[in-house]
Amino acid sequence: MLEIKRVEVDEFWADSTVIEAGDYVFVGYCMANEGKSIEEQINGAIDVLEVRLNMVGLTLESVVKMDCLFKDIEDLNALPAVLKERFAGKYPTRKAYTSDFIREGIRFQIDAIAYKK
C-alpha cells in the first residue's frame, strides 16, 4: 500500500486539510474573507486552495475536481466569472451544494482533489 501523507493537520477540528494519497492530493475546508461579498469569499477560498496546493508543489492547474459549498445556491451565479479569471481555461470538474455553515458570515467553501503527475 502506498503511504498516505497528512501534510496539514488541524488538531482543533480533528481533520487534515491536505492529504497526499498516491497520485492524488485532497484539499479540504478552503474558506476566507468571512463576512465579505461572495466574490471576495470565492477568491479567498481559491487563495487558500492555492497556498495548500503549493505546500505539495502543485498549482491550480492540477485541480481535477472541486466541491463548492454555498450558503445560498443563488451565489453560484458569481462562480463562473471568478473561475474564468483564476483557472485560465484549465477548469476542474465541479459540483455545487448548499450548506449551513458554523458561522453566519461564511457563504462559500471549497474542497478539492488535485492530480500530482
Q: Residue locations for each model-derived region?
A:
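N-terminal presequence-like segments and the immediate start of the first folded domain
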Residues: M1-V64, F70-K117
